[in-house]
UniProtKB/Swiss-Prot annotation:
Gene Ontology biological process terms, A to Z: cellulose catabolic process; xylan catabolic process
Signal sequence extent: 1-19
Keywords carried by this UniProt record: Carbohydrate metabolism, Cellulose degradation, Glycoprotein, Hydrolase, Polysaccharide degradation, Secreted, Serine esterase, Signal
Organism: Aspergillus terreus (strain NIH 2624 / FGSC A1156)
Protein's name according to its UniProt entry: Probable acetylxylan esterase A
Pfam families: Esterase_PHB (PF10503)
Gene assigned in the entry: axeA
């Protein structure tokens, strides 16, 4: 029989190795309660930055909110969206994780124009963001049925043009879109990344719900699964992305979901607040038009939580 001292030494060594391994595993995860950068989330074809907020009050099988920043004059960054939006505070209340992607381009707008980003697994910005989501689901045992996406301005365009219903519909359950344009509206025939499309921005790309739906569906050919429900905000005096884009975006998702755009179920004036009008086509589509509001419509965090099903 082995001496007791030898057995004790072996046990202590095993416990020490286990503790070190556990500590190393925890060290690989970002700290809770602060904005942290993640650099090893997987394939990142366009060098998009990943920042994450893990709440101190993390749920056992948490949801995920992807919050995509705006782009004006270089001020739109992951950190700016973290400090200027309510999602980190709401994460502490509801226990979900927030992913804040960071655009890789000078001026910090997103690529919503190239063929790569407008194609499922095409190697664009959208591909990188999708990989952030799958990484977070795996690392935190997140609930894959509770993954949501939101964004403002260029982030709104990335939200519904690329990452969400059009390009990665299988990843997301719902979205809120603040002051964006229809999916594919900024498409560049020269395949320019991070390209600006003045015709679209000025609200001059006008077509039918069926045509818009075909544009969105064409970004993931052959996909027949569920798509995230959409809540679309736009201001009546938006001079950056003119208000016609609101109507075209609503047309698009009415077409995608099979609703009759010209016959919504309900129109509610002064909802959710004075001078806002909410149009509901069905369970999967709402539009909120904000009279007197410019670019962008202010984030309504509590309403987002209700749309996502947290509240």
């Amino acid at each position: 029989m082995a001496p007791f001292s030898f057995i004790l030494t072996v046990l202590l060594y095993a416990l020490t190795c286990s503790a070190r391994a556990l500590g190393h595993a925890h060290a690989l995860l970002p700290r809770a309660g602060s904005l942290e950068q993640v650099t090893d989330f997987g394939d990142n074809p366009t060098n998009v930055g990943m920042y994450i907020y893990v709440p101190n009050n993390l749920a056992s099988s948490p949801g995920i909110v992807v919050a995509i920043h705006y782009s004006p004059e270089g001020t739109g960054t992951a950190e700016a969206y973290y400090t200027g939006s309510p999602y980190a505070q709401l994460a502490e209340q509801y226990g979900f994780i927030v992913i804040y992607p960071q655009s890789p381009y000078e001026g910090t707008c997103w690529d919503v124009s190239s063929q790569e980003t407008l194609t499922h697994n095409g190697g664009g910005n959208s591909n990188s963001i999708a990989n952030m989501v799958t990484w977070a689901i795996s690392k935190y045992n997140a609930d894959s049925s509770k993954v949501f996406v939101t964004g403002s301005s260029s982030g709104a365009m990335m939200t519904h043009q690329n990452v969400m219903a059009a390009t990665y519909p299988e990843l997301f359950a719902a979205a809120t879109v603040y002051s964006g344009v229809p999916a594919g509206c900024f498409y560049s025939s020269s395949n320019q990344q991070d390209g600006w499309n003045s015709t679209c921005a000025q609200g001059q790309v006008i077509t039918t719900p069926e045509n818009w739906a075909n544009v969105a569906k064409g970004m993931y050919p052959g996909y027949n699964g569920t798509r995230p429900k959409m809540q679309i905000y736009h201001g009546s005096v938006d001079t950056t992305l003119l208000p016609q884009n609101y109507y075209e975006t609503c047309k698009q998702w009415a077409g995608v979901f099979g609703y009759n755009y010209d016959s919504p179920q309900q129109v509610q004036d002064n909802t959710p607040q004075s001078n806002y009008a909410t149009t509901t086509w069905g369970d999967d589509l709402q539009g909120i038009f904000a009279t007197g509001v410019g670019h962008t419509v202010p984030i309504r965090g509590d309403d987002d939580m209700a749309w996502f099903g947290f509240a």
